[in-house]
């Protein structure tokens, strides 16, 4: 049973207490961070809030024993929410955050909403986000070995050919300074070529495709490239 309360008697009897109670003791099921001195911080200086403390205790178990996936979820999702919750905003992206999005489930001052019902909606939403983030982290880690193998087996180190689409940019950047293009099959059955960005997140390429190809399709592109099945650039 999930109870939202600050009643000290109820808190004392609870099996697990999160974000209230003024105590952090994972073995005793106490996960608050509001006490004087907080509840510790990560190696990168981001302090733990209650979400991070719960994830620290149960994250690996939630990720079916995969410590790498659990760490990826912490670094990509949990630690950001912890940073915002603890006011440690340096380095946190500006704009609307997941924390703010979830807080929008609370009734506004103009609404006569049921706070508990809104909380349950927020929990369902946050649970779905967490599930998808875990799946994404697991997929990214699984993809790394596939891309690494493609880099190792490439006939030309400048062109990496994948047998199926997998997320590749982070792995290519970490393992290959020579790769310029990545080729892979699309869902439509066609093959695609993508340029490798100069840096992760950059729109600048290590080596762009010829400018004369840009915006061409079908026969026009086929004529200029010499490829009789080229479709669009």
Language model segments and positions:
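Hydrophobic, aromatic-enriched interface-forming segments
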Residues: 82-167
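Generic hydrophobic, helix-prone segments enriched in Leu/Val/Ile
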Residues: 11, 73, 122-130, 183
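Arginine residue identity/basic-tract feature
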Residues: 4-6, 30, 36, 42, ...
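Gly/His-enriched, cation/cofactor- and phosphate-binding structural elements
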Residues: 149-233
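Short amphipathic alpha-helical surface micro-motifs
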Residues: 12, 141-143, 174-177
